[in-house]
Amino acid sequence: MVLEYQQREGKGSSSKSMPPDSSSTTIHTCSEAQTGEDKGLLDPHLSVLELLSKTGHSPSPMGQNLVTSIDISGNHNVNDSISGSWQAIQPLDLGASFIPERCSSQTTNGSILSSSDTSEEEQELLQAPAADIINIIKQGQEGANVVSPSHPFKQLQKIISLPLPGKEKTPFNEQDDDGDEDEAFEEDSVTITKSLTSSTNSFVMPKLSLTQKNPVFRLLILGRTGSSFYQSIPKEYQSLFELPKYHDSATFPQYTGIVIIFQELREMVSLLNRIVQYSQGKPVIPICQPGQVIQVKNVLKSFLRNKLVKLLFPPVVVTNKRDLKKMFQRLQDLSLEYGEDVNEEDNDDEAIHTKSRSYCRNKKAENSKKKSPKSNKKPKRKKQKFFTSWFTWGISITIGISFGCCVTYFVTAAYEHQTVKSLSLRPSILASLLSLDSSSDTINTPATASPSSTEQFLWFDKGTLQINFHSDGFIMKSLTIIKETWGKMNTFVLHALSKPLKFLENLNKSSEFSIDESNRILALGYILL
């Protein structure tokens, strides 16, 4: 390979002295012998390096090392077109300017990205927590195109289209071998693949990734009847839902939430287990069949108690159109709020902090203003309660005292009118309950009453007074007193209500009351007032 490179260099320096057919024959023989081994991703890039070294500039040691390590492709037409395109880039210092800056460590450790490398990075981002994904989105919005230092030799891949100059003669294409070379030069442009390391400061290609798109509110529908449910969703809400394109659980983190539709509880449990394993804490909306709401809630309690899943909306029955409409409206509102939150995150961190602080301050001020009138009203309410409580207690006490006085008055008046009209000495209430039955339960008291009074009310035997506490005497007398008191109260109230203006006259005219008891009536009136 070194000999071949030196031969080509000699031909480029003394092209006029050598015959034109010699260069083409040597290159064809080398390329045809190695066509089976030179098919690879590095062939176009190595051919570019070789052709850049043939433009009259001094070849770099890096280009010599790369040429000696890997063979050059044998397709002359493509090589010529690529050489022309890269010669057009040379005035802009995009091709050869960064080659001397590279060191040997970068060339040995540098690699070209393939589709497998990008897919691995995408999987790592998809399986990362939500906070990491948000940080990646923020970094992409800030315009940071520098790869992290943990991967200093990652390369960026970009397909670009460059215009080709007119037909020129170069040290490598002095004489056309076939008619295909003319067709290659007649093309206006050619598509090439350029790979650069992240360590270069010029012409850095951006890396495109699906994970750096703005997050969208999307719900994944899982279940055997998911397609039929998706068709039944109104068109205005279908944009919020999506059916799984691939039966891959690793795509769960891409969605905002997951809707599970099931017909049996076994299917629900299996879907929940998959979600717990792969969804990374995405909220869930269960949609069950009629009559399964209680069982579904019992199953969800165990998952919620262990903090395995989160509910975005309570369980909904498929046939309940009203609950489904509420769910759709709620999800639409959440999608609008989610979009507003994402737009707010696009602003600078300082602006967000100031807004949040000002918002908190305003909210605290509003809360303090709301609390201040409440604090002023609280003692007033306490005073009102205090006043009303004393008022009610006073009224209740006066009513109770007056009622008690009335009862005692009527009781004493009724009993005295029955028993003490003929007595010169008024006995007490206890004396009225005494009976003269000769029984064993007796209490001996000295006799002090006159014989006239003993003939009418009390009987004495041998200087002793016998008191009987049997039921036939004490209970019956108490019942008669209560009965008479109730009757007198009824008559008194009826007369008072019927003739309020002649209240005192009716009391004086009644046969049961005497004129001498007017002092008691006046005392009762003062108490009632």
UniProtKB/Swiss-Prot annotation:
The keyword Phosphoprotein applies. Residues 12-24 have a biased composition (Low complexity). GO terms for cellular component: mitochondrial outer membrane; mitochondrion; phagophore assembly site membrane; vacuolar membrane. Keywords: Autophagy, Membrane, Mitochondrion, Mitochondrion outer membrane, Phosphoprotein, Transmembrane, Transmembrane helix, Vacuole. It comes from the Eukaryota. GO terms for biological process: autophagy of mitochondrion; mitochondria-nucleus signaling pathway. Disulfide bonds: none annotated. Belongs to the ATG32 family. This is Autophagy-related protein 32. It comes from Saccharomyces cerevisiae (strain ATCC 204508 / S288c) (Baker's yeast).
